[in-house]
């Protein structure tokens, strides 16, 4: 089992996963990331959907790598610190 899978499994079992997801959603909204991704989707649809052949899966495949690069470093660092704190608290409980 990889470290990523272990962390994922622990956060699900401890109930912290929903807290982390909520924090992520809030931070992405606050920094304007969601609006940027929404605009990116619109632009791709206008550009490539002239013949109505772009599926949702194709849109997701094209947007996902670009959207990931748009996540601010501050948000990534905050989430990483939150996960480390959760894991450290778990270590202290054992």
Swiss-Prot record:
GO biological process: chromatin organization; mRNA export from nucleus; positive regulation of transcription by RNA polymerase II; protein transport; transcription elongation by RNA polymerase II
Main location: nucleus
UniProt-listed InterPro entries: TF_ENY2 (IPR018783), TF_EnY2_sf (IPR038212)
Keyword Transcription regulation: yes
Keyword Cytoplasm: yes
GO terms under cellular component: cytoplasm; DUBm complex; nuclear pore; nucleoplasm; SAGA complex; transcription export complex 2
UniProt subcellular location: Nucleus, Nucleoplasm; Cytoplasm
Gene Ontology MF term list: chromatin insulator sequence binding; transcription coactivator activity
Superkingdom: Eukaryota
Keywords: Activator, Chromatin regulator, Cytoplasm, mRNA transport, Nucleus, Protein transport, Transcription, Transcription regulation, Translocation, Transport
A Pfam family reported for this protein in Swiss-Prot or TrEMBL: EnY2
Sequence similarity: Belongs to the ENY2 family.
Role this protein plays: Involved in mRNA export coupled transcription activation by association with both the AMEX and the SAGA complexes. The SAGA complex is a multiprotein complex that activates transcription by remodeling chromatin and mediating histone acetylation and deubiquitination. Within the SAGA complex, participates in a subcomplex that specifically deubiquitinates histone H2B. The SAGA complex is recruited to specific gene promoters by activators, where it is required for transcription. Required for nuclear receptor-mediated transactivation.
PANTHER family: ENHANCER OF YELLOW 2 TRANSCRIPTION FACTOR
Classification via HAMAP family: ENY2_Sus1
Assembly mode: Component of the nuclear pore complex (NPC)-associated AMEX complex (anchoring and mRNA export complex), composed of at least e(y)2 and xmas-2. Component of the SAGA transcription coactivator-HAT complexes, at least composed of Ada2b, e(y)2, Pcaf/Gcn5, Taf10 and Nipped-A/Trrap. Within the SAGA complex, e(y)2, Sgf11, and not/nonstop form an additional subcomplex of SAGA called the DUB module (deubiquitination module). Component of the THO complex, composed of at least e(y)2, HPR1, THO2, THOC5, THOC6 and THOC7. Interacts with e(y)1. Interacts with su(Hw) (via zinc fingers).
The protein's name: Enhancer of yellow 2 transcription factor
Gene name for this UniProt entry: e(y)2
């Amino acid at each position: 089992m990889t470290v990523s899978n272990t962390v994922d499994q622990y956060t699900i079992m401890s109930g912290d996963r929903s807290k982390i997801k909520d924090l992520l959603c809030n931070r992405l909204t606050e920094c304007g990331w969601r609006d940027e991704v929404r605009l990116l989707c619109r632009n791709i649809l206008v550009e490539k959907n002239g013949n109505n052949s772009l599926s949702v899966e194709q849109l997701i495949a094209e947007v996902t790598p670009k959207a990931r690069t748009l996540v601010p470093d501050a948000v990534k660092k905050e989430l990483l610190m939150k996960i480390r704190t959760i894991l450290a608290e778990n270590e202290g409980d054992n």
